[in-house]
């Protein structure tokens, strides 16, 4: 993207679909107030929108949030939130991004970026493969090129999240050690917030009939100050008086027996 092969971003779609139902006992331990049982449907958005923002260098300026209803297969495991969420972002150049996350019935990390001179996308069934199409001088002409990118550091090949766990940590440590060469590959605190705050404000949008919410640029002190005491979230220990529930189902509270059963499965090594 930074070479300009597909031009300026117009629209992107990104998915981090991870049906966690089978592993829910081993990652929540039957704890009612485990953060995964308290998060909203759109909270876990960095894995989907992060690569788009990092590749393009663009900042999100507005978000609308949507969620599915809370499905029984997750509620029976102690999760009361909407079982999947969607964010629609507007970026600073006017581009639109659609992000889909969480417990849909497949496991996939998929990205497609449409530029004004071409398109690039990951393969839906072979996550290691990339497809790129560049426009020629005449409109609607061009060829597809498909290839499998190689790791720049083979030590990443065994790391989680497609090598991302290795690279983000490695570059972060290198930067702390004073290696300026890795600066283009590191994520600073403002970029990190840009990748996660759409999920927080996206849930505010969901609670307000999916209305668009402006995303602050926290690099600017005036915009930071406007949000300094805003603790709105679904985590009671952090939100204080601004706490909102992640359960919009209208159903009765999940009984203690559910969490006891999930804890039993965890200790027994049984799936969800």
Residue map of PLM features:
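Short arginine-rich
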Residues: 198-208
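Glycine-rich beta-alpha junction loops
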Residues: 14-20, 67-72, 93-95, 103-105, ...
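Active-site beta-strand termini and strand-to-loop segments that position acidic
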Residues: 80-82, 87-94, 113-115
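C-terminal glycine/acidic-rich active-site capping loop/insertion
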Residues: 32, 54, 62, 72, ...
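Glycine-rich phosphate/pyrophosphate-binding beta-alpha loops
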Residues: 46, 95-109, 161
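A general structural signal for well-ordered alpha-helical segments in protein cores
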Residues: 48-49, 169-170, 199
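Predominantly a Rossmann-like dinucleotide-binding segment in NAD(P)-dependent oxidoreductases
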Residues: 1-79
């Amino acid at each position: 993207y930074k070479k300009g092969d597909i031009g300026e971003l117009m629209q992107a779609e990104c998915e981090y679909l991870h049906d966690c139902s089978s592993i829910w006992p081993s990652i929540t331990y039957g704890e009612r107030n485990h953060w995964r049982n308290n998060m909203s449907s759109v909270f876990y958005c960095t894995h989907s929108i992060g690569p788009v923002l990092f590749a393009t260098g663009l900042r999100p300026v507005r978000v609308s949030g949507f969620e599915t209803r809370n499905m029984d297969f997750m509620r029976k495991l102690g999760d009361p939130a909407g079982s999947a969420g969607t964010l629609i972002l507007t970026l600073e150049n006017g581009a639109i991004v659609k992000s889909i996350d969480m417990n849909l019935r497949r496991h996939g990390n998929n990205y497609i970026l449409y530029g004004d001179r071409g398109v690039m996308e990951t393969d839906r069934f072979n996550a290691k493969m990339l497809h790129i199409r560049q426009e020629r001088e005449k409109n609607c002409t061009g060829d597809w090129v498909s290839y499998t990118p190689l790791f720049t550091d083979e030590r990443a090949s065994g790391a989680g999240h497609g090598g991302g766990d290795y690279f983000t940590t490695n570059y972060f440590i290198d930067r702390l050690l004073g290696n300026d060469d890795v600066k283009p590959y590191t994520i600073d605190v403002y970029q990190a917030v840009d990748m996660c705050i759409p999920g927080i404000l996206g849930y505010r949008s969901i609670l307000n009939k999916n209305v668009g919410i402006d995303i602050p640029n926290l690099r600017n002190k005036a915009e930071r100050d406007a949000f300094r005491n805003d603790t709105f979230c679904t985590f009671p220990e952090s939100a204080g008086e601004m706490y909102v529930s992640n359960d919009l189902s209208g159903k009765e509270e999940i009984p203690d027996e559910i969490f006891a059963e999930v804890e039993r499965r965890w200790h027994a090594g049984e799936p969800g």
